Amino acid sequence: MFLFVGERFWGRASGVTYTDLSLIDCEFNSCGVERDTGDPRNHIERISVMGAAQLNCSIADALIRDVTIQDLRKLGSAPLFLWGCLFERVTLSGRISAIKINQTVGLPNAPADRQRVHNSGAIEFYSSSDWALDISQAEFPGGVTFDAIPGDKVRRDPDRQVIVSRAGLARSDWRAIDFDGTAIDYALSWFEQEGLFDSVVLAERSDRKWAKRDHAVLRRLCDAGIGLA
């Protein structure tokens, strides 16, 4: 295990493998892990990150396995973007300021079939995975999306993070619920129309402006039999 404390990282790479690292109070500035045509999938495994900060960073088309991230803050306005990644035994805890997990591979010059191959691969990958992500001890002040991960593979705090099934949406008039401007209805609409999996996890924001409203909406979903605490 290689230890880095207070280091600053920048730059971009494709088709890389990062393993057996411990990073404490490090800063990542405009870092990008990409996958150019012809390069293998990126691998990020057995890594511990504590107290990191990121500015305009992204990870695309990576297998992220046995990784823990505790407290992640953003230095600019952009979240950490994750494009077309697969997760296995990844734990987020503490304050995770902004992270966007996208189902799309997000590569403008990727071959036309890249998304199709990713989608079928993701379904197969998660069908044999025990669990993908643990967010039970995490707070998300800026919000987070988990559309790219099947809800039943996410370990969560049922008081702040609920699971919604595709079947639950289908048998309900969920659009009639008062979403109070939270945009949770947009997340559900995207899941219903574009999601790969049968369930998704919704997490309330911890920011003071949104926490109570998000919590109330998630309770309404549960009371209506759409969400499961």
Q: What are these model-predicted stretches?
A:
Residues 1-175:
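Tandem repeat scaffolds
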Residues 159-229:
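Long, ordered, amphipathic alpha-helical scaffolds
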